[in-house]
Amino acid sequence: MAKRNVKGLYYITHVNNLHSILQYGILSHQQVEKQNIPYTHIYNPEIVANREARKTSDGYSLWAYANVYFQPRNPMLYKVISETDKNEVVIVGISPQALDIKDAFISLGNAASPLSPILEVDKGLELITGEYWSIINSDWWKTEDGTKRKIMAECLVPNVIPPRYIHSIYVTNQTTADKIRPILNNFTLPVAIVVEPHMFFQPRKHGPITHQLFWVDGDMFFSQMQTLTISVNTVGVMGKGLASRAKYQFPDMYVVYQDVCRAKTLKIGKPHLYKRETSLDEDLADVPSSLPNLNANKWFLLFPTKEHWKQKSDIGGIERGLQWVVNNYETEGIQSLAVPALGCGLGGLNWKDIGPMMCRYLSGLDIQVAIYLPQEQEIDPEFLTRKFLLGE
């Protein structure tokens, strides 16, 4: 059965609700009110109200169903941790056996949206593990192609998902794990506490190099830095790696990139800064209009590491590009900067060579700079030290 591909279901909630969830299970909104259970809300009232109006084929409102996600790292979680201290948010891991609960449904996307079909479980699973699978397992989404809605696909269970289906609690850091451990000690069934910062859009690991410069193991496209650096060639092709993701996630940036390549103004040693005028929250958060403060506009630094996409990265050209950053970041208005390990991965360069060179230049900037480690290489901790990277 297709269900074998579904490793778990997930419920996003406030840490204050854990005690009642472990006691009563994950309740529908209707049951929370009916049983008068104290509950700390993390969802916008407008979102909750929208769900009341939509009904399943059984004639019941979505309020009558406990709803869990197939993918918790989604626009709703992004919105929640934009409004709530991430240390107060937990994700409850549910066994996929909950899909067998009688009269459950699957919504192919955010169930509140009329664009999301609500289907019986067998048909819904066939689609979730088929054409929707790559969307469910994606690291990003867009409004235009529907992936922002579809990645929030839900399993809808009448009234309650009993506590026996709970197998894990995911948290963003060890502090939250320590906070909830006493709660779980009183729960008779075994439940694992899993520290998984990536699930909460946080770096897996990070460490200081100087007071302004640090290395990060994580997803650069969720960085809080104002400007994101994209490694590119100068012939207008974004085929693989970070550039390929940027091309599809930010098509307006790709248009600008092609324009500067055609105009031959993008050259080795001369990056191009695209000052985008759209907040990343608008792209990533569910119902971004209700966020109290949208984050600042995200800029892109198109940084050539080679001339042709078939070539290996040009370390001399990268060094000239870094010098350009040093000379121009203040006048261009760059306030903080995220940079991948330039030329590593598909470019063929090694962190042992490029890391120290990047740090020599970027450590002199009077702004915060995050260097994102190459995902294609395992970096030994000794090559992440200040002594190795700066010779100090």
Region roles according to the model:
Residues A66-F70, V232-V235:
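Short, hydrophobic, well-ordered secondary-structure elements
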Residues A2, V89, N186-E392:
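Macrodomain-like recognition of ADP-ribose-binding/processing modules
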Residues A2-N67, R73-H211:
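Active-site-proximal loop/hinge segments that shape catalytic or ion-binding/gating pockets
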